[in-house]
A protein has these predicted regions:
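PLP-dependent enzyme catalytic core of the Aspartate aminotransferase-like
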Residues: 5, 196-248
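Conserved small-domain helix->loop->beta segment predominantly found in fold-type I
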Residues: 118-194, 209-215
Length: 248
């Protein structure tokens, strides 16, 4: 299970999923990359394995490719042992050191980014050229109560929103216009960085799906995902306004 999900920030009730999985003799693995251990600790809610992309929040500055699988020694050896023996597991020492340095500021970064993301999400929700905002920290999010309970009262640093427009072609053009008009945000698929990133999921993370598959998943051509960094909030609002305010 991935919670929150990419890019629509849907949530899974980890405790409920763990109970369901264990009742049927199954294990539960949770991808906690979007929340980080600062907001959410799946193992304490019953998950058997917790996985992370260390490239994202754990590093926080997009410097390394890294990942982690966390669980009991016995379980990790059972599910990963053959792979580890065949392919190896350890990061290069320098990359491991970089991630360790990132962990030193993880709590400060995640809390600051979550606070900024909430304010930016509120601003986007009120913008006339934004059709819908997806952010667990907003009361309008369908799973807001679960987010507050499961994520320590914070919504995280990732926001998704739909721009206005009629038809797939115009929606895509409008989304590209907003992204291309930014100067502070970095157009990249990475997230969790101290630098705010912006991306168009329909042509990046979900680009290999058919249009019908994207629509079924709720990924429209007008959808934009933002990972909020540590820039001044006024700068981010001005950066996004440049494109949003000039949409037809």
């Amino acid at each position: 299970a991935e919670t929150p999900t990419n890019p629509l920030t849907d949530l899974c009730d980890i405790a409920a999923l763990a109970a369901l999985a264990h009742a049927h003799g199954a294990l539960l693995a949770v991808d906690n990359s979007f929340a980080s251990p600062v907001l959410q600790r799946p193992a304490q809610l019953g998950a058997d394995l917790v996985v992370y992309s260390g490239t994202k929040l754990l590093d926080g500055q997009g410097r390394v490719m890294a990942g982690a699988v966390c669980g009991s020694t016995a379980l990790v050896d059972k599910v990963m042992g053959a792979f580890m023996r065949s392919a190896g597991l350890n990061l290069a020492p320098f990359n491991a050191w970089v991630v360790l340095k990132g962990l030193e500021t993880l709590s400060l970064r995640v809390k600051a980014q979550s606070a900024a993301a909430l304010e930016l999400a509120r601003w986007l929700e009120a913008h006339p050229k934004v059709a819908r905002v997806y952010y667990p920290g907003l009361p309008s999010h369908a799973q807001h109560a679960l987010a507050m309970r499961q994520q320590g009262g914070l919504g995280g640093s990732v926001i998704a929103f739909d721009v206005v427009g009629e038809g797939a072609e115009q929606l895509r053009a409008n989304a590209f216009h907003v992204a291309d008009s930014t100067r502070v945000c970095s157009i990249t698929a990475n997230l969790g960085d101290v630098k705010t990133t912006i991306t168009h999921p329909a042509s990046t993370s979900h680009g290999r799906l058919t249009e019908a598959q994207r629509q079924a998943a709720g990924i429209g051509q007008g959808l934009i995902r933002i990972s909020v960094g540590l820039e001044h909030l006024d700068d981010l609002k001005a950066d996004l306004s440049r494109g949003l305010d000039t949409l037809a």
